[in-house]
């Protein structure tokens, strides 16, 4: 029920297709934002999510699903989105993410998702969704990943869905201070 409440069709309906950049709201002067990314190239998807954080509930204002492209292109997508909205940012620095960390131009926090850090990343994000603290337009790809994720995907041996990782990274970034500078 919380996932269904999070995705509001009145905010827009989008597929979330490959390389479909979705901008629900352009940057607003004085607003605050947080961006998160999950990296993938060959098998899964690189997802970049930006939250507007000076409103309640926080609102997904930009979404990109990409992949099967060279790393420099996807890193540039992330840097461009962070540059456009400003604010704080986090990305998955697990595995190849540590290499990517060396190429990101923005001041993003690289988060290694292991052990207690991984658990708290997902727990905090899930609690925010359950408390109605995050809303998003109905993005079919993102909604499906959120709706069908299992406990094993997040806390066990399964694979955490890409849009959940990106959303959790954006939510984590929202807990850091950051005001857009014009």
What is the role of each PLM region?
Residues 1-37:
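ATPase catalytic-site recognition across NTP-hydrolyzing enzymes
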Residues 2-3, 45, 133-138:
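Proline-centered turn/helix-capping motifs that create local helix->coil transitions or kinks
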Residues 27-53:
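Gly/Thr-rich phosphate-binding beta-strand-loop-beta motif of the actin/hexokinase/Hsp70
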Residues 38, 92, 162-165:
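Acidic active-site catalytic centers that drive phospho-/nucleotidyl reactions
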Residues 44, 97, 121, 162-166:
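Catalytic-loop motifs flanking and including active-site residues across diverse enzymes
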Residues 47, 73-77, 165:
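Well-ordered alpha-helical segments embedded in enzymatic catalytic cores
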Residues 52-153:
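Mg2+-dependent endonuclease catalytic cores in nucleic-acid-processing enzymes, primarily RNase H-like
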Residues 148-182:
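Charge-patterned, long linear interaction tracts outside catalytic cores
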């Amino acid at each position: 029920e919380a996932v269904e409440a999070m995705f509001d069709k009145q905010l827009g309906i989008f597929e979330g297709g490959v390389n479909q950049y979705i901008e629900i709201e352009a940057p607003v002067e004085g607003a605050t934002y947080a961006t998160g990314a999950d990296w993938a190239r060959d098998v899964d998807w690189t997802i970049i999510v930006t939250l507007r954080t000076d409103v309640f509930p926080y609102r997904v204002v930009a979404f990109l699903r990409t992949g099967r492209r060279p790393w420099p292109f996807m890193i540039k997508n992330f840097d461009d989105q962070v540059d456009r909205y400003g604010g704080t940012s986090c990305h998955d620095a697990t595995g190849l993410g540590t290499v990517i960390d060396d190429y990101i131009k923005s001041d993003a926090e690289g988060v290694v998702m292991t052990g207690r850090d991984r658990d708290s990343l997902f727990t905090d994000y899930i609690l925010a969704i359950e408390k109605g603290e995050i809303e998003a337009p109905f993005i079919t790809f993102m909604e499906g990943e959120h709706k069908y994720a299992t406990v094993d995907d997040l806390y066990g041996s399964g694979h955490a869905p890409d849009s959940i990782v990106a959303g959790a990274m954006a939510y984590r970034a929202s807990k850091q201070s950051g005001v857009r500078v014009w």
